[in-house]
UniProtKB/Swiss-Prot annotation:
Residues 1-21, 694-719 are annotated as: Disordered. This is ATP-dependent RNA helicase homolog DQX1. The lineage of its organism: Eukaryota, Metazoa, Chordata, Craniata, Vertebrata. SMART domains: HA2. Residues 8-20 have a biased composition (Acidic residues). Residues 248-449 form the Helicase C-terminal domain. It comes from Bos taurus. It is found in: Nucleus. Its main location: nucleus. InterPro entries: DEAD-box_helicase_OB_fold, HA2_WH, Helicase-assoc_dom, P-loop_NTPase.
Length: 719
């Protein structure tokens, strides 16, 4: 079989002079001249030397599992999917197609574009991709690149998994929650709806290879040789810079002025610093015009979308590229033209605390293997250069060897919902590469129980099954379902999309005019209604990009929200949930929307304790303030802060801020939250007040029922 597969590429891909009639076996069309040019580049990749042994292992592995270990830039992410496509083609597609998972949607999109180009095929036909709000596949697709969380959602849903001949789990060393869980499910053979002879290929950096070998029980392993050439010797700074962005900009300008050949890759901790660096460099490189074409400055982060392809395109007149990125490009996005690397040695990551149900933005050193992967970007003949904006002792003393598994740092409620959907009653029955903390699992189960997603036996309830269908956080999915009861589905669809998409506001207003335009979008009822108002104004503008720029809005995020809203609407129609007519702005709709939100977010309620905006969280007695971006704080003549608020998120990274906040009435909390939730609140004045309201409501209900009974008895007596 392997020898036959070799023939697909080696013999059907001759030079144009050797055969003008060679056709592509995937679509039956003659190869283009670009195919041969790219084929020569592919054959020069380090992974090409391992092609034959990989195909042998893929055919003969007793367990159906093959492990591939290779450094960033060796070509494994682009070539292995193509070889697997040849594998299923040689079988006449009798055993399904090839699915490749990626930990980041942007990586799935970028790889699909590149691989379709290398295979001389049309994107969306034989090669496609599936990422949030964008499914570029068709009936002819045999090679699909997919965000790993989407595949996990498919596996858990009633839609089934479809036929797959080969499943490739790429970039396993990134340790995403979905990738780790997919490996656990596959290892335990719990994907019963997949073909029995499914092939699984796990692709990783060498740093995680020993752990994966042990986890999978010693499967056949392909070790990709290192790139030719040596790695640069890193140059360290004596101390951490006071301003990372300025230090990185100065280093870039120095390299450009020295006319050192090659492109530059800059690693900074966050998207905010990436944007600041790109803005600063774009201004400063204009001074280099007298030395030739100014460098082209390009950001690379999850919000780039299809613009990511600019990092691969040739620049006009041979201008240098300066790519500014963060942890996203530690292992993904191989850029062969990079000769210089600037590494801040830091990353900004969200870390979830289950004890207080809060996220914090943690600035921390990257792992040692991440730092090594960054340095390898500049390997070659001769080696490039690597400037580390930190002392040599910084990582040696403070950095772990491997990246932290995301299963230790994320809210696991959605994960638990999927495990329950797979009928794994106990988390202990599922194998993890690294087991989550017990308190994180217990908090996730407790949250699902409060949301009525579990029955008395701890299995998914009927409501929980429906919740698991939605690509939303469980509490947001519950609020969306509650909107069916309260007749505000249209507004909740918009709100769910806006809360799930990237943030719509990119930055604070830069001038008085922009601030006034943005203030006009604020709604008196709070941030949730403001988000709905922003979306509706965006749609009324015709999704105009200039309209967004004038108000400091993220046009790409709003477009993403529009797509997601359409997906959610289609899903609700498919499972036959009731819809409602738009009624945004009416008094009744305002109350109904609050009730729907409280139905899902009763765990996220706070009370102003002293009338000054110091809010005490009901569930954990932490004190927090409203975010500076909250509409209640941005009003010119602020009244007394709302007494009771519902919030979307609580961050403990800076000043304990509540984000996306709206006022609610405590009576709604008593009416809609489970009674045992109120009973389990920690002792506080707020709990006593809510329990008093509950008793009054119970007494009122008893009196009303008694009055109705008396009236019925009187009516019977008259008869």
């Amino acid at each position: 079989m392997a020898s036959q597969l070799l023939g697909l590429e080696e013999e059907s891909g001759p030079n144009p002079e050797e055969s003008e009639l060679a056709v592509n076996p995937f679509d039956g069309l003659p190869f283009s001249s670009r195919y041969y040019k790219l084929l020569e580049q592919r054959r020069s990749l380090p992974v090409w030397a391992a092609r034959f042994i990989f195909l042998e292992h893929l055919e003969s592995s007793p367990s159906g599992v093959v492990l591939v270990s290779g450094e960033p830039g060796c070509g494994k992410s682009t070539q292995i999917p193509q070889w697997c496509a040849e594998f299923v083609l040689a079988r006449g597609f009798q055993k399904g197609w090839v699915t490749v998972t990626q930990p980041y949607p942007l990586a799935a999109l970028s790889l699909a574009l590149r691989v379709a180009d290398e295979m001389d095929l049309t994107l969306g036909h034989e090669v496609g991709y599936s990422i949030p709000q964008e499914d570029c596949t068709g009936p002819d697709t045999l090679l699909r690149f997919c965000w790993d969380r989407l595949l996990l959602q498919e596996v858990a849903s009633t839609r089934g998994t479809g036929a797959r001949g080969v499943l490739i789990l790429d970039e396993a060393q990134e340790r995403s929650v979905a990738s780790d869980l997919l490996q656990g499910l596959l290892r335990d053979a719990r994907l019963g709806s997949l073909p029995g002879d499914l092939r699984v290929v796990v692709v990783t950096d060498p740093s995680l290879e020993p752990k994966l070998q042990d986890f999978w029980g010693g499967p056949p392993t392909v070790c990709v040789p290192r790139k030719t050439g040596s790695c640069p010797t890193p140059v360290y700074r004596d101390s951490l810079p006071a301003d990372r962005v300025d230090a990185a900009c100065q280093a870039v300008l120095e390299w450009c002025q020295e006319e050192a050949p090659g492109d530059v890759l800059v690693y900074l901790p966050s998207e905010e610093e990436i944007s600041l660096c790109c803005e600063s460099l774009s201004r400063k490189v204009r001074s280099l015009e007298n030395q030739g074409p100014p460098p082209r400055v390009l950001p690379l982060h999850p919000g780039c979308g299809q613009a990511v392809q600019a990092v691969y395109e040739d620049t006009e007149s041979g201008a240098r590229k300066v790519v500014v990125t963060h942890w996203l490009a530690d292992f993904s996005f191989s850029l062969p033209s990079i000769r210089h690397v600037i590494d801040s040695g830091l990353e900004l990551r969200s870390v979830y605390s289950p004890q207080i149900r809060a996220e914090s933005q943690v600035l921390r050193p990257v792992s040692k293997c991440q730092a090594e992967a960054r340095r390898l970007r500049a390997a070659g003949i001769p080696p490039g250069s690597c400037l580390c904006l930190y002392p040599k002792s910084f990582l040696e003393l403070e950095a772990p060897y491997l990246p932290q598994p995301r299963v230790w740092a994320e809210n696991l409620s959605s994960l638990m919902l999927l495990l329950k959907r797979r009928q794994i009653a106990e988390p202990g029955k599922c194998h993890f590469l690294d087991r989550p903390a017990p308190e994180a699992l217990m908090q996730a189960l407790e949250d699902l129980d409060y949301l009525a997603a579990l029955d008395d036996d701890g299995d998914l309830s009927d409501l929980g099954v429906i919740l698991s269908e939605f690509p939303l956080a469980p509490e947001l999915a519950k609020a969306l379902l509650a909107s069916c009861e309260f007749d505000c589905v249209d507004e909740m669809l918009t709100l769910a999309a806006m809360l799930t998409a990237a943030p719509g506001f990119t930055r604070p207003p830069v001038c008085a005019e922009e601030a006034a335009l943005r203030r006009a979008l604020e709604h008196v009822d709070g941030d949730h209604s403001s988000l709905i108002q922003v979306y509706e104004a965006f749609i009324q503008s015709g999704a105009d990009k200039a309209w967004c720029q004038a108000r400091g809005l993220n046009w790409a995020a709003l477009c993403q929200a529009r797509k997601l809203r359409g997906e959610l609407l289609e899903l609700m129609q498919r499972i036959e949930l009731p819809l409602s007519q738009p009624a945004f702005g009416s008094e009744r709709n305002r109350r109904d929307l609050q009730k729907a939100l409280v139905s899902g977010y009763f765990l996220k309620v706070a009370r102003d304790t002293d009338g000054t905006g110091n809010y005490l969280l009901l569930t954990h007695k932490h004190v927090a303030q409203l975010s500076p971006n909250c509409c209640y704080r941005s009003r010119r003549a602020p009244a007394r802060p709302p007494l009771w608020v519902l919030y979307h998120s609580f961050s403990i990274s800076k000043d304990n801020c509540l984000s996306i906040v709206s006022e609610i009435q405590p009576q709604m909390l008593v009416e809609l939250a489970p009674p045992y939730f109120l009973s389990n609140l920690p002792p506080s004045e707020s709990r006593d007040f809510l329990n008093q309201l509950r008793e009054e409501r119970t007494d009122s209900s008893i009196r009303s029922e008694s009055s109705s009974t008396q009236e019925l008895e009187n009516a019977c007596a008259l008869q």
